[in-house]
Amino acid sequence: MKLMVLVFTIGLTLLLGVQAMPANRLSCYRKILKDHNCHNLPEGVADLTQIDVNVQDHFWDGKGCEMICYCNFSELLCCPKDVFFGPKISFVIPCNNQ
C-alpha cells in the first residue's frame, strides 16, 4: 500500500512539474476600442477588412481568413472562424483576401 502511495505521489509530482505545451491552435482574444465606436475603428486595428457590406460589424483580422472579429460597442472580439461560426457553416463565409 505504501508503495502504491509513493508511486502515485511521484506520478502526480511529475505531472504537475511538467509545463503544459500550448496547442497549435488559434484562440480568441479581445481588443478594447478607445472611442467605443465600431464605425471609427482606431489605427491599431488597421489590418481589419470588412467581411461583406451586408454583414455589419464583422471583420477579417490580418491578411488571411482564419480569424474573424466582431465589433461589440466598446471592444472587438476576435476568434478563429471555426470557433466563431462553427465548423458546419464557417466554410460558406465569403473570404476576399486580396
Swiss-Prot record:
Signal peptide, first to last residue: 1-20
Compartments it resides in: Secreted
BP GO terms, sorted: nervous system development
Tissue expression notes: Expressed abundantly in the central nervous system of adult, but not at all in fetal brain. High levels of SCRG1 transcripts are also observed in testis and aorta.
Pfam families named in the record: SCRG1
Claim: RNA-binding is one of the keywords in the record: no
Keywords, in A-Z order: Glycoprotein, Secreted, Signal
Record: glycosylation sites: 72
Source species, domain of life: Eukaryota
CC annotations in GO: extracellular space; Golgi apparatus; neuron projection terminus
Similarity-based family: Belongs to the SCRG1 family.
The name this protein goes by in its record: Scrapie-responsive protein 1
